[in-house]
Amino acid sequence: MREPDFLNHFLKKGYFKKHAKAVLALSGGLDSMFLFKVLSTYQKELEIELILAHVNHKQRIESDWEEKELRKLAAEAELPIYISNFSGEFSEARARNFRYDFFQEVMKKTGATALVTAHHADDQVETILMRLIRGTRLRYLSGIKEKQVVGEIEIIRPFLHFQKKDFPSIFHFEDTSNQENHYFRNRIRNSYLPELEKENPRFRDAILGIGNEILDYDLAIAELSNNINVEDLQQLFSYSESTQRVLLQTYLNRFPDLNLTKAQFAEVQQILKSKSQYRHPIKNGYELIKEYQQFQICKISPQADEKEDELVLHYQNQVAYQGYLFSFGLPLEGESIQQIPVSRETSIHIRHRKTGDVLIQNGHRKKLRRLFIDLKIPMEKRNSALIIEQFGEIVSILGIATNNLSKKTKNDIMNTVLYIEKIDR
């Protein structure tokens, strides 16, 4: 194939349509060097600004010389290049994590939104076979994604439809360690695949076909389940056990960097079935939150050490506080205005709950903790609930409960109204 053929494929696929700056992961091997040649030659046609990034793994004598040569190559092409050196005990997993952390740093520094890698169809076959041998979940057998959004960046693999034999022989560096069988991927490439191809000469095509078929099923399930609210456990549990598992796995696809193991997935299932309330980190900076018949998985956000200070509102005054407008004795108009009888004789305190808080209901004092449990109020709502207090007594827990004084007491003491309107924060 000629270079213009690759350009036409890139344009047809629209890989760089949404991107002005792209970082190319440049290893120095044939695939990444040819991708460098295509992208640097056709920057104008692709309408991108190209930035190079290289990791020197320091595992071979030649690696420092290769780094120098790549610096020269970047200078000749008048392109910026960022280089980082790997240190510490080497493993495939540690090296991969190091590379992607470094690439993200480069993207943040340069304002690039696309990371381009030179993975090709042969890499795809090796990846699917590795995952199959390790016993991964079915959806992961679809292999490497052609385009993958991770956070605010997109990883693009424009060579995924091509085999290594499609690339012309150009200047590149040969990693002699690829011929050794110390690493799993090398054993797949050098030993297992050649043996399997003796049984089926089209074995690579067969593996790629299976990967594409699994991807089709995955996309179809996602589309068909689009109107199912998996986070609503009543809805989720209305399906069979098998369907529940598939729906939950499809839901987890929303978090590509979560990567739960089979054991962790089973644990999440068990928590959803058995716990009424639960909040705990699960993996990779995510937490599972369950509140009765609802659950969600989300990134752990930093929590403030303390709630906002208590607010004091005086008669004939208004204040906006935590998403509400409070108006003490000054009427507000509108259908959604909440009205709470209060006294004009003293100020109103608005705050969050404290240990030992009680509310008077039907003449009896009830601890807020017990009230929240009885009403099955989720923990997050308990912590964020606004309490309206006057004369040292709780008048109302906003949106949850109100102090139901006797009619005579209300008429004697409550001689004005606190108007409350929900507003945007």
UniProtKB/Swiss-Prot annotation:
Its EC number is 6.3.4.19. Its main location: cytoplasm. Transmembrane segments: none annotated. Signal peptide: none annotated. Keywords: ATP-binding, Cytoplasm, Ligase, Nucleotide-binding, tRNA processing. It comes from the Bacteria. It is an enzyme of class 6 (ligase). One of its GO terms (molecular function) is tRNA(Ile)-lysidine synthase activity. It catalyses: cytidine(34) in tRNA(Ile2) + L-lysine + ATP = lysidine(34) in tRNA(Ile2) + AMP + diphosphate + H(+). Ligates lysine onto the cytidine present at position 34 of the AUA codon-specific tRNA(Ile) that contains the anticodon CAU, in an ATP-dependent manner. Cytidine is converted to lysidine, thus changing the amino acid specificity of the tRNA from methionine to isoleucine. The N-terminal region contains the highly conserved SGGXDS motif, predicted to be a P-loop motif involved in ATP binding. Belongs to the tRNA(Ile)-lysidine synthase family. NCBIfam families: lysidine_TilS_C, lysidine_TilS_N. This is tRNA(Ile)-lysidine synthase. It comes from Streptococcus pneumoniae (strain Taiwan19F-14).
